[in-house]
Regions:
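Conserved histidines in hydrophobic membrane contexts and catalytic metal-binding motifs
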Residues: 41
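Catalytic core of pol beta-like nucleotidyltransferases
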Residues: 1-38, 46-52, 63-110
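Short beta-strand->loop micro-motif that forms the acidic, two-metal-ion catalytic signature
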Residues: 57-59
Length: 110
């Protein structure tokens, strides 16, 4: 596995939800470096409805939630996936959107 500061960009290979999951799982050690306790996809990525310009919606829970972990993970995922990443923590979920997000959740790291 590459060290946390080395990113392999797989965005040209992402054509399905399964590709996205495989890439994230292959990079699990680096995700853990950023303190990821659990990571789940939601939205179009979880429903396998991503399009060329789609962002990737990610719900993440950290072992230790710090600004450095959050920003580091966001930039790492965007570099890795070649897409904008909407990174959300459970505390940031709004009550109005929480039910629709929860029904889509597809855990990749838990």
């Amino acid at each position: 596995m590459p060290p946390p500061n080395k990113v392999y960009n797989f965005y040209m290979l992402i054509s399905s939800r399964d590709d996205l999951i495989a890439i994230l799982k292959a990079n699990r050690p680096t995700l853990q470096h950023y303190g990821v306790k659990s990571l789940a996809l939601f939205g179009s990525a979880a429903r396998d409805k991503m399009r060329k310009g789609s962002d990737v919606d990610v719900l993440v829970q950290f072992d230790q939630s710090t600004w450095k972990n959050y920003i580091g993970l966001k930039f790492y995922l965007e570099d890795l996936l070649g897409r904008e990443v909407d990174l959300v923590t459970p505390k940031a979920l709004k009550p109005a959107t929480k039910p629709s997000i929860e029904k889509d959740l597809l855990y990749v790291v838990s």
